[in-house]
Design a protein with these regions (language model features):
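Signature aromatic-anchored transmembrane alpha helix within multi-pass, membrane-resident enzymes
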Residues: 9, 13, 70-77, 187-191, ...
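Membrane-interface transmembrane helices that cradle and orient dolichyl/undecaprenyl
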Residues: 181-184, 220-242, 250, 359-365, ...
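Short acidic/glycine- and proline-prone juxtamembrane loop motifs at membrane-interface regions
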Residues: 202-215, 391-392
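Membrane-proximal lumenal/periplasmic loop motifs of glycosylation machinery
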Residues: 89-100, 114-138, 157-160, 205, ...
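Start-transfer (signal-anchor) and selected internal transmembrane alpha helices
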Residues: 1-86, 290-301
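Transmembrane-helix motifs of polytopic, lipid-linked glycan transferases
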Residues: 56-60, 156-184, 222, 355-362
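Transmembrane-lumen/periplasm boundary regions of multi-pass, lipid-linked membrane glycan transferases
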Residues: 102-110, 261-271, 289-369, 378-388, ...
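C-terminal luminal/periplasmic domains and tails of membrane-associated envelope-modifying transferases
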Residues: 468-504, 509, 514, 518-645
Length: 645
């Protein structure tokens, strides 16, 4: 037996170890159902299994990490650890909106697994049709379970649970592109290529804000590694299983990665088709036929299997009009999106890409690579902008294409490193330092470090001047009003008994209910005592909890910080309606000075809601009601009927 084990490869031994671990987890669950150890150990097992699968992907792709590569990766991971510790420790950020979704889901998934393994896995499975699934929660529990479980802890723990696997696959992608480009100076190419990719601000942006969406890039990079130089010359079952699994996993991680999947596979199929045509023209018709046959066979079987496996997601996509419901987030279509893509790239990265394209054209090395990357980016952009304009987290779905273009630039510099060596190394180091210093804020629109925020018109949004934008960015990224926010949260907790609620009208980046709900994480004492809020047409339903609330909170001046569409944003409309009739139904009971020019006022309801009051507020949203009656008048009528009004 020992002889058999000794003859196994390292990957095979690791696989046996994982199998033994899975058996131990089954025994633990049977012996101690609902154990608090089960979910963290499952998460650790999944992280190790995913890392092992990443190594399998590298082997199938024909990529090997030698001692030099492994040493560089260890150094990069250590630097990332220090960076995350510094970046998270140098700010006071209150997790809200999308930035709080994952940590709250992590709490909920933990609670589900404490009820038993079956309950926990069912909780994860039942979420697959939601915009935010619980799939990633399976991988981020360890080592989060060992931390203080704050929002910053959740962001920091991704360096352990996600980054190692992501780094290995990114390094593999760098090497694979280098193989295809036949780079001779592999030392500088690897350092430059990996350095530019790993320090690109939008790779880490969402992670530093509590959104582990970069988890999906593990599977995106796997797809690239398995396809870039594969032309379906033969049937490769192992490669096909890995491709199918990576595609399913990336869709489960975040549904909007579908735009990458569709854009990339279409571009890749076109590349294989062109390759087959060229092969046929060269007189090799049978190999060309085999390529197309294998491509179609894999594509059709995979598509059918994917529809069956992910039918709940497919059904939800087909039945839900995202373009209509998310129209508020569509801030200008393709023209705006192109501008944002270039703004997020930054001048130096655009120069780098330009050098890579010139290098590819000049040397005629792998013209298919920039064509594949460019077409994937363009198609994904066209598909995405039919629904909305990208936020910082959505930038991740374009990174595989952009990174391929980065690597072209790295190859161009590395191959000519002997000429103007110091200048080129200086350019590389400067861009890395500049990229590392970029502020990871919800309002970061352009890749600029702290000292340039507000000092250039490039940082201004369409709604604010550069100076105002910088002020808002400072207020939201590094909160100086946390004591006041916590004071209001404690006031609500004290004055609202079980079953009673408060309603907060402001709902924007500066102040929204989530700031007050999540200001004491991991404790959420007012989660059931403060209503969610109301702001986005097509997403937020008419707020009947406003009429049920014991207290209503508003602010003066009313916050309208960096809202997407000021004219159609709904919280300020609700506030205007409230101020016009507040004295008929409410009395002022408390005020809070937030220390930044904003004052919160708390109003207590003194008169029971009536049909006339509901109709008055509903009349202020006639336009929205005409578009979404099921979210306005129908909701109001059902509430009135249920309350005998």
């Amino acid at each position: 037996m020992n002889g058999i084990v000794s003859r196994l490869s390292a990957l095979s031994k690791a696989g046996l170890g994982l199998a033994a671990g899975a058996l131990a987890l089954i025994i633990l669950n049977l012996a101690l159902p609902g154990s608090s150890l089960f979910f963290p150990l499952v998460s650790l097992w999944l992280d190790l299994a995913l890392f092992l699968l990443a190594l399998v992907v590298l082997r199938v792709a024909g990529v090997e990490l030698d001692l030099f590569h492994r040493a560089v990766l260890a150094g990069v991971w250590a630097a990332a650890l220090l960076y995350a510790f510094w970046a998270l420790g140098s700010r006071t950020f209150v997790y809200h909106w999308d930035y709080a979704n994952y940590i709250l889901k992590q709490y909920s998934t933990e609670a589900a697994f404490l009820q038993g393994a079956g309950v926990g896995f069912r909780f994860v499975f039942d979420s697959i049709t939601e915009d935010y699934t619980n799939f990633i929660s399976l991988f981020t529990e360890f080592p989060f379970c060992l931390s203080g479980k704050t929002g910053d802890d959740y962001a920091f723990c991704q360096v352990f649970s996600i980054l190692p696997t992501l780094l290995v696959l990114l390094a593999g992608l760098v090497l694979k592109a280098g193989q295809m480009l036949r780079v001779k100076n592999r030392f500088w190419y690897f350092l430059m290529g990996l350095g530019w990719c790993i320090t690109y601000p939008w790779l880490r942006m969402s992670a530093m804000l509590g959104q582990p969406d970069w988890f999906g890039l593990i599977f995106a990079f796997s797809i690239l590694l398995l396809t870039l130089d594969f032309r379906f010359e033969k049937l490769d079952p192992v490669r096909f299983v890995l491709l199918f699994s990576a595609t399913a996993a990336i869709i489960l991680s975040r549904r909007w990665y579908l735009y990458f999947v569709v854009g990339y596979y279409f571009s890749y199929a076109l590349l294989v088709l062109v390759s087959s045509i060229r092969t046929a023209r060269a007189g090799h018709r049978h190999p060309a036929f085999v390529q197309l046959r294998n491509l179609m066979l894999f594509g059709l079987v995979s598509l059918a299997a994917m529809v069956v496996l992910l039918w709940p997601i497919v059904r939800h996509i087909l039945s839900f009009d995202y373009a209509d419901r998310y129209s508020y987030y569509n801030g200008g279509g393709m023209v705006t999106e192109i501008y944002q893509q270039y703004a997020r790239m930054g001048l130096m990265n655009l120069v780098l890409i330009g050098m890579g394209l010139w290098y590819s054209l000049k040397t005629r090395k792998m013209p298919a690579l920039p064509c594949l990357a460019g077409l994937e980016i363009l198609l994904s952009m066209l598909l995405f902008t039919r629904v909305q304009t990208t936020g910082s987290q959505h930038m991740l779905l374009f990174l595989p294409g952009w990174f391929l273009l980065f690597l072209l630039g790295a190859a161009a510099l590395a191959e000519g490193i002997t000429r103007r060596r110091n200048l080129k190394i200086g350019f590389w180091l400067f861009t890395i330092v500049f990229a590392t210093s970029v502020r990871c804020s919800p309002l970061t629109l352009v890749a600029l470090p702290d000292f340039l925020i507000g000092r250039t018109v490039l940082s201004a949004s369409p709604q604010e001047s550069a100076r105002d934008f910088a002020a808002i960015d400072d207020l939201t990224y590094d909160r100086k009003d946390l004591p006041q926010i916590q004071a209001i949260a404690k006031w609500i907790d004290t004055h609202c008994a079980e079953g009673e609620i408060s309603y907060m009208i402001p709902h924007n980046m500066l102040y929204c209910p989530d700031h007050f709900k999540n200001c004491l994480l991991p404790e959420t004492p007012i989660n059931a005592k403060l209503a969610f809020g109301f702001s986005v047409p097509g997403v937020h339903a008419f707020p009947m909890q406003f009429f049920e609330a014991k207290y209503v909170l508003t602010a003066d001046p009313f916050p309208m910080a960096h809202v997407n569409d000021p004219e159609n944003e709904m919280s300020h409309k609700l506030n205007d309606l409230f101020l016009a009739v507040r004295d008929q139904y409410f009395k002022q009971v408390e005020t809070f000075d937030m220390g930044n020019g904003t004052t919160f006022t708390i109003w207590e309801r003194t008169a029971a809601p009536t049909r006339a009051e509901v109709d008055y507020y509903l009349s202020g949203f006639a336009q929205e009601d005409a578009l979404y009656p099921e979210m306005f008048s129908q909701v109001a009528e059902a509430w009135l009927t249920g309350h005998g009004l």
